[in-house]
Amino acid sequence: MVTILDTINPDAKRVRHPEKAHRPDTEVMRKPDWIRVKAPTSKGYAETRAIVKEHKLVTVCEEAGCPNIGECWDKKHATFMIMGEICTRACAFCNVATGKPNALDMAEPENVAKAVKEMGLSHVVITSVDRDDLEDGGAEHFEKVIWAIRAASPATTIEILTPDFLKKPGALERVVAAKPDVFNHNMETVAGNYLTVRPGARYFHSIRLLQRVKELDPTMFTKSGIMVGLGEERNEVLQLMDDLRTADVDFLTIGQYLQPTRKHHKVESFVTPDEFKSYETVAYSKGFLMVASSPLTRSSHHAGDDFARLRAAREKKLLVAAE
């Protein structure tokens, strides 16, 4: 298990999670066999890493310690994390560093666009840290990144995974107006866990955010994801599904929570593959166009393939409705 120190940047001396340093170590459960993944060693992984470093980019794959980094980077898939690597929030589950962020890098939109073109991406996912310090929460920067990618690689479809833009009037409208192909905002966990797991956020604000996207652009695909294994009850997960469907969300992802350090929220349970399959079945019955539910599912895992299936599912639904 990694320590509280920054383990992403080998030269860093700062504490990665200062707000968690005073906490007692939590119990660490042994991972079941279905969670284990191979260490990244492939040529494709090395090439992707080189491109990321060349353009001085940050990826959520590294910062969040994603277990799928070896598989995704081998295929030259990466999720770019814009607006720096320091977040203004301190969620109990997240491995991204907390603190006072640096000023925005004005060259970042062009650098991201160059990397997308160089990697030949047909679909790209752009996420960010929370930037509560910015007047618009980073909405203009998202807009610039989307525009830069459109200019450099017009055929690439763009998926964004945004923060909640809490108390940032007009921010959401600006991002939606930039016309990403998929708007993703993760609920992360059930309503009853928000005070302990996601204390800086508001459950119904996030639901309303996703609903508002559809009001602004009914044709835009919306997506959200949660982690399980944080002590939630099954009925709470089903209620969250209902809340997302009320907001007309198209795509739901469900994955196992994995504890980054002993200072983070403990894993309360490892949900079995059969339970994930059951959640998938129920979610489809509630009307989601696309559901990805498995222990290693993450928001941007297989995002390009999933987008193709999502688009096909909508076309099929429209054809059926027209008959």
Curated annotation (Swiss-Prot):
Report any Pfam family annotated for this entry: Radical_SAM
Pathway the protein acts in = Protein modification; protein lipoylation via endogenous pathway; protein N(6)-(lipoyl)lysine from octanoyl-[acyl-carrier-protein]: step 2/2
PROSITE patterns reported in the protein's UniProt record: RADICAL_SAM
Question: Which SUPFAM superfamilies does the record match to this protein?
Answer: Radical SAM enzymes
Can you say where in the cell this protein is located?
A: Cytoplasm
Q: Which UniProt keywords are listed?
A: 4Fe-4S, Cytoplasm, Iron, Iron-sulfur, Metal-binding, S-adenosyl-L-methionine, Transferase
**What reactions does this protein catalyze?**
[[Fe-S] cluster scaffold protein carrying a second [4Fe-4S](2+) cluster] + N(6)-octanoyl-L-lysyl-[protein] + 2 oxidized [2Fe-2S]-[ferredoxin] + 2 S-adenosyl-L-methionine + 4 H(+) = [[Fe-S] cluster scaffold protein] + N(6)-[(R)-dihydrolipoyl]-L-lysyl-[protein] + 4 Fe(3+) + 2 hydrogen sulfide + 2 5'-deoxyadenosine + 2 L-methionine + 2 reduced [2Fe-2S]-[ferredoxin]
What NCBIfam families has UniProt attached to this entry?
lipA (TIGR00510), PRK05481.1 (NF004019), PRK12928.1 (NF009544)
| Descriptive protein name | Lipoyl synthase
Which organism's genome codes for this protein?
Answer: Rhizobium etli (strain CIAT 652)
Q: Which taxonomic lineage does the organism of this UniProt entry have?
A: Bacteria, Pseudomonadati, Pseudomonadota, Alphaproteobacteria, Hyphomicrobiales
The UniProt gene name for this protein comes to lipA
